[in-house]
Amino acid sequence: MKRPIERLPAATSSATRAFALATSLLYACAAPAASWTASWQASPQPVWAEDFLFPSNVPAELHDQTVRQLARISLGGTRVRIVLANTYGKRPIRIGRATLAKPGSERAAVATGSLHDVTFGGRRTATIAPGATLLSDPVAMPVTALSQVLVSLYLPAATPMETFHWDGRQTGWIVVGEQTQSHALQLDAADSQSTSARLLLTGILVETETATRTLVTLGDSITDGASASLDRNSRWPDFLAERLAPHGVAVVNAGISGARLLSDGMGASALARLDRDVLAQPGASSMVVMLGINDIAWPGTAFARNAAPPTLEALIAGYRQLIERAHNRGIRVVGATLTPFEGALPGTPLSDYYHPAKEALRRQVNEWIRHAGAFDAVIDFDAALRDPEQPSRLAARYDSGDHLHPSDEGNRAMAAAVDLDVLLDEVPDGTPAEPRADSATK
C-alpha cells in the first residue's frame, strides 16, 4: 500500500531538518535503476517419441549445425539477454557460438550492421547442464517494442533434441556448419531444414531505464496459438501485446499446446511449471490463466482413453493453488473463461474430444470463474467468442475450422475484448489487490 507522507515534528533541530532535506533531494535526483524484464518466452517441453499422436517436426539430433530463430519481442530496451534451456536433456549441450541481430529484408537474413556476438560469462562458448538454463551476458543492442530479433546458435557437437517448444508459430532455419556470422543463409541447400518449433531458445530479456511490468499468459493451445497463421504473430497474446506496448507493459506467452491444469500433457501441468514459466519471469506482475479445457476433454480420447474426468472440485482446487502461489509472490491473477468447443477436431483421432457431459463441466467451471471472486479480475473469452444462437459453439467468424481453436480474427477479438483498465489495476507497491468481481472484459 502507499505510505502516507511523513512530516517532521516542529521541534526537530535545524541541523536534522537540513540533513533530511539533503537526503530527500539525493534520492529524488538519483537516476532510476535499470531493470531487466521478460519480453518474449517459449515454454520448454520434452520432445516426445516418434510414435506419439503428433510428429515433433524436429531432428532427433543436431551436429555441426546452426539454428537461426526469429522472435518478436513485446517490449523494447537498451540491452538484450537471451535464455537457453536444456530442461529435459540428459546430456550437457555445448554452444559453440551465438549471435544476436536484427532481421534483414530477406528470409533468415541479418540487417547490415546489426550483428552482435553473444557471450556467456565473457566467453563465446558455453555448456548447458542437463536440466539447466543458461543466461547470456547483456548485449548492447537497443531494440524497440514489437520489433523482431534473430538468434543464431551453433552446435558443434552431437546434440540430441530433447527440449523444445513444439508449436512456435514461427519459421526457424537449420543449416550445416558454423553460420552464426552469416548475413544470409543458403536456404535452398539440400541439407538445410526449417521448423516451426523453438529449439533451445526459451526467453529474451530486455533492459529498460525504468521499472516495467510483465504480463504472463498461462494457457494451452489456444494461448499457444494453434491455428494462428504461421509467421504472422497472430496469437491472442500477440494482439494483446500490441495494445499493452504503449503502456510500457510486456506480454510473454507461457502457453503450451496440449497443456493441462492438473496433469501433465504435451508438457508439464500448470501446477508443476508455474514457478518456472511464471513466477521466475523477471518483472512478472500479473498473469492471465486460461486452462482446463484439456483436463475436461482429454479423458476418453486417444490421449487419455481410460482416464476419469476431473471433478469440478478438483479443478477449483487447482485454480486456487495457482492463485495462492502467485499472490504469495505479489503477482496478480486474472482468470479467463473457457471457450466453446462443440464439434471439436472432426475427422481426427480426437474427434471424441467433445461430449455433452464435458460441455456441462465447462459451463460449471466458467460460472465459478465468473462469480466465485477467487481471481483478481476475470476475462470472459467465452462470451467474446461463442455463437449467440449456439453458445456451446464458436461463432463462425472466429472459428479456425476445427471448432476448438480461434482463427486470427478470433484471436484478435479475444485481445480486443480485454478491458485494459481492469487488467492493469494493481496496488502501487505490487501487493495483489483484494479479489474482486470486476470483469476485465469490455
Identify the role of each PLM range.
Residues 17-28:
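Bacterial N-terminal signal peptides
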Residues 2-19:
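Bacterial N-terminal signal peptides that target proteins for export
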Residues 32-218, 228-231, 426-442:
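N-terminal secretory targeting modules
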Residues 40, 63-70, 92, 98-104, ...:
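Conserved SGNH/GDSL esterase-like catalytic core that processes O-acyl groups on lipids
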Residues 271, 297-299, 339-442:
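Catalytic His-Asp segment of secreted/periplasmic serine-dependent ester chemistry enzymes
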Residues 319-327:
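Surface-exposed amphipathic alpha-helices with a cationic face
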